[in-house]
Amino acid sequence: MTEFSPDAAALRAALAALGPGRVWRPVHGPDGTLLAPGRGPGPECLDAYVAGLDVAGKTVADLGCNLGYFAFLAARNGACRVLGCDSDPEVAAAANLLARVHGVSNVAFTALDFLAAPAPERFDLALFVDFVGRGVVAKGRLAAVAAAAEAWARREAFFTLHPVYALEALAVPPDVLAARHPNCVRDGRFFVAEALAGLLGPEWSMRRLTDGRLDTGDASLRTKTALLFTRNT
């Protein structure tokens, strides 16, 4: 990365201001320099998340994008245009700096709470990478996620998530969970993928792209599943 570029200097300053707690995934400069390590697995694991996903020629929304690892990956894999959304304005600003430093013109970022704000348009594909987790389930936000998928995705919605949680892993009483998602609490477990499919309804078909697991070599990710929902009409 050219050290004398004003955008490069601004990006380094922005990443330093964010600190490691707000950078979820590795950030690299155009020359491959690691600018921020992120908190999770490396590229070899992350790229496996979307290995079975066809983005070529599609418009893509990366919702809950952080610094846009999957937004940039979608562009490299042939997406024609990508919009990344993150609720943190400083993160979105840093992601836009990153796009400029890389010279990527078909990826942009905006600060937006996509669970509350209306979608500016519908995209061919909406990505929800690692967005649905214990917090979303416990706070009763799964229905809002399904509504966001309906609003943002014209044709497809992609999720990576744990399809099943043990009830003791969730900070919500089982009866509350059962009231929210009938028939999805049984045998001491909550079936997240089933609940999401039920919320999206019969207009969508669900396909597991990873046959029930993300086999990335990282043991912490092996219970995650990549799901693709496709509109039937």
Locate each region found by the language model:
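Conserved SAM-binding motif I beta-strand of class I
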Residues: 81-86
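Conserved SAM-binding strand-loop segment of SAM-dependent methyltransferases
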Residues: 103-114
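Glycine-rich SAM-binding Motif I of class I
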Residues: 68-72
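Conserved SAM-binding loop
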Residues: 95-96
